[in-house]
């Protein structure tokens, strides 16, 4: 990503960016992968925030499976603060290809989320696993039902009781 492109991203409003990237979704993927690999600075964190907002607002993730890989990578990356938004995307996707990624995000400890007494990321991830409704998702929820954290256990048990887990598994992505 060039300096001019970064300037465009940081100076444009969300509507302009959404319109631009709806026409060029591959460019959004390319930029997101590039920025993820850069040294983290206030600017790169801002750009990641903008991109995640665009992915959610533009529902890019529903239109293009190529977003799964970068979202999975970002979910593992502790150098930004968008994990809850990524969990929301996973909840909306409920993709069997992302089961391991969703599970790993559920149990990931993030210093910046210490204040979150309700473990919202874990809640969204357990919903994602429940909505996925496959035997592999059930296995992950059963593991979470044994988690040392009482809320995570409760979230997992709620999803286990809510779904039948009879949907067909597909090859996992991660």
Predicted segments with their positions:
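Extended amphipathic alpha-helical repeat scaffolds
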Residues: 1-11, 168
């Amino acid at each position: 990503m060039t300096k001019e492109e970064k300037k465009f991203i940081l100076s444009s409003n969300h509507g302009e960016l959404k319109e631009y990237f709806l026409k060029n979704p591959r460019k959004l993927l390319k930029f997101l992968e590039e920025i993820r690999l850069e040294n983290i600075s206030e600017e790169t964190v801002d750009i990641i925030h903008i991109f995640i907002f665009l992915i959610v607002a533009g529902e890019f993730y529903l239109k293009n499976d190529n977003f799964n890989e970068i979202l999975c990578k970002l979910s593992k990356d502790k150098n930004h603060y968008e994990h809850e938004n990524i969990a929301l995307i996973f909840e909306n996707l409920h993709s069997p290809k992302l089961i391991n990624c969703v599970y790993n995000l559920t149990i990931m400890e993030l210093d910046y989320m210490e204040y979150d007494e309700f473990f919202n990321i874990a809640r969204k991830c357990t919903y994602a696993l429940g909505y996925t409704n496959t035997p592999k998702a059930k296995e992950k929820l059963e593991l979470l039902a044994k988690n040392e954290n009482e809320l995570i256990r409760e979230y997992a048990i709620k999803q286990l009781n809510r779904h039948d887990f009879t949907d067909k598994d597909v090859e996992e992505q991660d």
